[in-house]
From Swiss-Prot:
Residues 117-126 have a biased composition (Basic and acidic residues). This is Equatorin. The gene is Eqtn. Sperm specific, including germ cells (at protein level). The chain crosses the membrane at residues 184-204.
């Protein structure tokens, strides 16, 4: 690859060297100026480049693409690069994917006609070649002397804007917007207070009511009836031990529950069997009952209404005594029948 590039470059630059000799030999006695020499060299370069391009095109037509495979390149791309020159010329470079490129130069400047006109472009080219040197020294000298430097128009954007150019309406609008924001914040805070205070009051009231309802529910569950308390409570007599107290309490609670049933059975029997007994037999029975039964205990219950009289309720022992007496009477009356 390097060998091919050397051959191509030698074909490009050798015609330029050959073309320079006849120009100097044609006019040996005449000395050309620098500008005329420059333009003559450029023309010779263009002629040599055109000859080289024709040679390259002929070589492309003759040479095969690849001797080993025998296949030709189908996707060959061509790239063109153009670069402008300071003196007004343009350099365009064309390159392809098969490593073959060519250099072209296009010139826009025209040759001068008079000697006076020849000097002017040379001076202008010299001035334009170094345009920043005098400006740099002037700026540096002014900076050392602490003098104000007149900058370009673009630098004016970095200067501060005078206060007169600013609009006073912007400040008014900003102040109005700040006032509106403050009013909105105050309104929102007041609304939150107005909503939160009633909610707190309602919550405290509901909690207080729930507490009272809970207390009432406990009282209703464990309510005390004085009548039941007097019936269930047992008063032991003197000289009774703890064991007898517990047994008597059990028996008392048992007889309290069954006293009502006994009374109902007694009334039914009295209605179904009317009997006539003599006075002697009744007396004997009563004497026998008084001999082995304990004294009766009577209890008084207060009436629920003021118009009613006091109700005397017999104890469970009296009811048992009456039942036993009734049974004895039935036994005595059965043989007589």
């Amino acid at each position: 690859m390097d060998f091919i590039l050397l051959i191509i470059l030698s074909g490009v630059f050798l015609p330029d060297i050959i073309s320079l000799q006849p120009i100097v030999g044609q006019e040996p006695g005449v000395t050309l100026s620098d500008e005329e020499q420059y333009y003559a060299d450029e023309e010779n370069n263009t002629d040599g480049n055109s000859v080289a391009l024709h040679k390259l095109e002929e070589n492309e037509m003759d040479t095969p693409a690849n001797e080993k495979t025998g296949n030709y390149y189908k996707d060959i791309k061509q790239y063109v690069f153009t670069t402008p020159n300071i003196k007004g010329s343009e350099v365009s470079v064309t390159a392809t994917t098969n490593l073959e490129f060519a250099v072209k130069k296009n010139y826009k400047a025209s040759k001068p006609t008079a000697s006076g006109e020849e000097e002017k472009p040379s001076e202008s080219s010299r001035k334009t070649s170094t345009p920043n040197i005098p400006a740099f020294w002037t700026i540096l000298s002014k900076a050392v002397n602490e003098t104000a430097v007149s900058m370009d128009d673009k630098d004016q954007f970095f200067q501060p804007i005078p206060a007169s150019d600013l609009n006073a309406t912007n400040e008014d609008k900003l102040s109005e917007l700040e006032e509106i924001k403050l009013k909105l914040m105050l309104g929102i805070s007041l609304m939150t207070l107005v909503l939160l205070i009633p909610l707190l009051i309602f919550c405290f009231a509901t909690l207080y009511k729930l507490r009272h309802l809970r207390d009432k529910s406990y009282e209703s569950q464990y309510s005390i009836n004085p009548e039941l308390a007097t019936l269930s409570y047992f008063h032991p007599t003197e000289g009774v031990s703890d064991t007898s107290f517990s047994k008597s309490a059990d028996s008392n609670s048992y007889w309290v529950h069954n006293s009502s049933e006994m009374r109902r059975s007694r009334t039914r029997r009295s209605k179904s069997k009317p009997m006539d007994f003599s006075a002697g037999s009744n007396q004997t029975v009563l004497t026998d009952e008084s001999s082995f039964l304990p004294p009766e205990e009577t209890r008084f219950l207060l009436p629920e209404e003021p118009g009613k009289e006091l109700i005397v309720e017999r104890g469970p022992m009296q009811a048992m005594n009456e039942i036993d007496a009734q049974l004895l009477l039935n036994k005595e009356g059965s043989p007589s029948n």
